[in-house]
């Protein structure tokens, strides 16, 4: 079944299993990937390829993947892994790519993922891109924000269609929410937000 092929790891029931390596994060380390999920329908509209990058400083209580807080968890992201991701995503049954973690808005992850997103826009422009972050868009991802990287963040955000932002708050957990875990989190139409300069929520917010 093509929906269960391996991308840089061993495919098991739609999941790409990565060999874990637990070490403390060090500044300047190259991006690691904890898991790649194929045939994913839970993290965005339609059928998706989902990349769980490693590294997160939010450490939200109740996080469903605390092992991915470690920046060195999983496997080193390589050009070969990127090629396999592009090949997998090129299948017509995929609607797009989702970035999860860990947190794809950590500085090193922005830098590591930017070339992948640029390739998708060049080679697979029909695919949409979603990203999840525990950070808050207008506080952390704008000039002067704690996750804003000069020369990187604006390019990166301009390539993303939908951003789900905000930390997971266990006391606000609600299982009926669309594509998010707690009521404080927002599904942002990032294209319209970037165009208008004001937060535009996606109709999927419920």
PLM segments and residue spans:
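Residues embedded in well-ordered beta-strands within globular domains across many folds
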Residues: 37, 98, 161-164
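Structural recognition of alpha->loop->beta junctions
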Residues: 144-172
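Low-complexity, intrinsically disordered or signal/transmembrane-proximal segments
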Residues: 3-4
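P-loop/Walker A phosphate-binding loop and immediately adjacent motor/lid segment at beta-alpha junctions
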Residues: 118-121, 173-206
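N-terminal pre-triad scaffold of radical SAM enzymes
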Residues: 32-59
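Conserved Radical SAM active-site core
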Residues: 22, 28-34, 47, 65-146, ...
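Residue-identity detector for glycine
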Residues: 8-9, 13-14, 28
